[in-house]
Amino acid sequence: MRILCDTNIILDVLLDRAPFVEASAEVLKRCEIGIIEGFTTTSCITDIFYLVHKQLHDNERSYQAIEQLLTILRVADVTNSHIAEALSHRASDFEDCLAAVCAKSIHCDFVVTRDIKGFVGFDIPILTPSELIERMEL
């Protein structure tokens, strides 16, 4: 199974955001041990660094968070054609639209996010972390 992890899932774990951290951590754990092939986008990486640094006020811990993340998830490149396709959708949430376009281009089965409404209208299934775990346990 191939998934694209949205920014909020990763931040739940890195910033220990209750009550979401448990399910999000389980998704990343399954990626880490190879049960799931997990991806994020290049733009997500820069957003995560910025938001972790803003919260922790610690450059070194922010760099370490990204280094650790890169041992768990693969990074899907954002290309000119992805951006052009996302722009053509005229979606209200461009960031989520771009993530959906990238996920489709690398043949992900799902986008995993807590921001379901940001991904409405795209031709890729969307699951919350809890829904993904539940689906895998059936």
What are these regions (language model features)?
Residues K117-I124:
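Short loop/helix-cap segments at secondary-structure boundaries that form the rim of catalytic
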Residues D12-L14, D47-I48, A84-A86:
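A short acidic, helix-capping loop that chelates divalent metal ions and anchors anionic groups
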Residues T40-C44, H82:
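Short, conserved alpha-helical segments within structured domains
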Residues T71-I116:
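Active-site neighborhoods of divalent-metal-dependent phosphate/nucleic-acid chemistry enzymes
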Residues A25, D47-R74, T79-S81:
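Active-site-proximal, substrate-binding regions of enzyme catalytic domains
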Residues M1-T40, K54-R61, G121, S130-L138:
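Short, well-structured N-terminal submotif of metal-dependent ribonuclease cores
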Residues A76-V78, I126-P129:
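Short acidic-hydrophobic, aromatic-tinged amphipathic segments that line or gate anion-handling sites
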